[in-house]
């Protein structure tokens, strides 16, 4: 089935309705589990989830937490995941809502409501390599070694569960609003508290006229993006992958593998051509970009500061602060247009630490940074938060962002698995 055959109205062919699977279970709280790439260094978190869920139907049984990647039981766990997916489908635990979208409201711990639309993207329009000017692009460099273990899970899996957050640059705040304003007219699919302090979530079915209006508004947004960024690119980025970069890259890799093994006519409408994501607005008040600072230990702070001033600084430019011992220095980075301070600093540190002693760590919070910087042979570099309107131009100008550029909320605020979609015929 092709998701593009929807009539004559002018609509997006990048973000599309899908045949969305919704669980028919007694406990949605036990069904919904946080993204597999969270709490990877805290196996006790996953032990608590396992104990809470038990044998009840849950997405915990349909995914492999990354804390278990590389373990001796990995292959057996993957086989069990794929078997459980089939069993859930055979037991009618998953109801299909054809050619639909789901509007989601997630109440975070700070009380703010994060809104999104669950739908499918066409992987033909997505690339995780910076040299390809696709409409959908990764925001961080893809670590290629992280893809094969994920492919083992997805390639033979009958269904997918999304934790990918796709961001649109809707500075006018128009795209999601057209659905929010008509929320009272939509069928509510679920509402419940998420486990492990994940907040509260509710979802509504988006179909009929509201769906058509949303897709038309989305197409208008895509056209505006072409005009907005015409000076940066003939084929500008329209959507950015905010969370779940490696999961989406895995979906693309599986689709490319399928293309190699089949003629185009046989797979052009294959469900694996698409991937389920949640679309959110970069400019929504609930989206908070928090800076991630750098601390370098086991190094000579004076020498590092001297090299940094020589290679990266001028009398004017982006202000940053460096801390070492009881000292604080204010520096001004010499940046080219659309370049981020974190890009300049990370490039410098990568080069400097190849030839000099020192280890880098990534720190949240200025107070923690300052405290750590008091230690001997340690220097902390405080970086400014990235402005929201810097994201799209930076990716289009410099390719993917440096690792640990910014943080979008706390771990417990990441997406939970709820909706699904068949990816096999």
Where does each model-flagged region fall?
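Short beta-strand segments
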Residues: 167, 242, 278, 382-384
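N-terminal extension/subdomain marker
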Residues: 3-198, 207, 224-228, 386-401, ...
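Structural beta-strand/beta-sheet cores of well-ordered domains, especially the beta-sheet scaffolds
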Residues: 58-60, 162-164, 237, 272-278, ...
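Compact, glycine/acidic-enriched structural inserts
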Residues: 181-206, 284-311
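C-terminal catalytic or substrate-handling cores of phosphate/nucleotide-
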Residues: 293-405
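Catalytic or ion-translocation cores adjacent to nucleophile or general acid/base/metal-coordination motifs
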Residues: 245-307
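Conserved active-site loop/cleft motifs that coordinate metal ions or position small ligands
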Residues: 240, 379-384, 418-420
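Active-site beta-strand/loop microenvironment that shapes enzyme catalytic pockets
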Residues: 216-262
